[in-house]
């Protein structure tokens, strides 16, 4: 928190970043805000670039636009021949559009290519106090740095490319404070799943959330990105964490981060954008970190989640008819019975990756549970680094060998099995322990059944063949 000068109005982190980016507020219309960074990928950008070509427009600020290929790319091969006809068309179209409009592109052959929300921060493209947009719902990831980051639609992608601005209504503010410290075996993924379980998948609708408290402050930048990544899963517009020394240490020296005198000036500004003492939030949610256990989803949205030492809930215990019906529908799809201990649920697929959990810290955590063990009979497990940099670092540390020797498949960077948009997908009836962010019906493939967990929990499930409580011997 920062101290407010006498007679000044106390503001939240979000309010400060918002106010600094309002370009104009036309009467009777939504405010226009400036966009500092625009990230694009092969799926939501083709129509936007086509619109510019038809209108004869150029990019307003090509140096502030960064592109990569991630959603449709193969994690088995870097060859274009490995792609489906549609995927190949999309990546080739992105390459041509970037060439035509002068956009920096990290293509499938670039050593820094990767998932847009992994490579952006690690290159220093993301930093505090900025507004960042991308045609992807998990853009909130970048809020871990104290940036205002959110996903936009294809028509908005075109608008930002052309004007470097966007019309936006100001959101309400919510503070989610996680007090105290978590116990061993509890990760950032467990924290955010517990939050969503508490407020529901629509509890944050209409808000920009600021995550704070000792448990959040104790997280690494990788952990904070995991938390902010799933802000959208509670319905929030964006999630943010106030920048601090952990943030500055992470950014120092990265390719696109400020340098020299600009660095000192930037840090001074970043330190000043924290929420002021006395700032009022529209809503406040509190959790005790000590109460959070390793989490595991049982249904078909991230809010349908319980602790690993719990049981599948019974819809009959739910008083709200709508919620009860939703629970019954979820259990029918997921193929579970009320009262089943979570540790009795067997799996046959494991996915460690996605923009939620594919960073080096995530892979290290998973490797602890893979080392010296073997993937259980009948289980297929894949590990997909989030970027070329993550892959190289993991291989330098020997993590790839740990996974391969245990029977995991070691893949190339990409979005992979998070969504059924490439050649990594589940078959009908498969049950997967996944470190991704969505467990919707068919998300990983038609008829697939997804359980969201942390990387450590996923790796442990891979070797056990079922979910286990990693806080205990197994």
Curated annotation (Swiss-Prot):
Known catalytic reactions: (2R,3S)-3-isopropylmalate = (2S)-2-isopropylmalate
GO BP annotations, alphabetical order: L-leucine biosynthetic process
GO molecular function, one term: metal ion binding
Protein name: 3-isopropylmalate dehydratase large subunit
Gene label: leuC
Subunit structure as annotated in this protein's UniProt entry: Heterodimer of LeuC and LeuD.
Similarity remark: Belongs to the aconitase/IPM isomerase family. LeuC type 1 subfamily.
Function in brief: Catalyzes the isomerization between 2-isopropylmalate and 3-isopropylmalate, via the formation of 2-isopropylmaleate.
E.C. code: 4.2.1.33
PROSITE patterns for this protein: ACONITASE_1, ACONITASE_2
Listed Pfam families: Aconitase (PF00330)
Cofactor binding notes: Binds 1 [4Fe-4S] cluster per subunit.
Cofactor needs: [4Fe-4S] cluster
Pathway(s): Amino-acid biosynthesis; L-leucine biosynthesis; L-leucine from 3-methyl-2-oxobutanoate: step 2/4
The entry's keywords: 4Fe-4S, Amino-acid biosynthesis, Branched-chain amino acid biosynthesis, Iron, Iron-sulfur, Leucine biosynthesis, Lyase, Metal-binding
Biological source species: Shewanella putrefaciens (strain CN-32 / ATCC BAA-453)
Keyword 4Fe-4S: yes
Positions of [4Fe-4S] cluster binding: 355, 415, 418
Enzyme class of the recorded protein, top EC level: lyase
Gene3D superfamilies recorded: Aconitase, domain 3
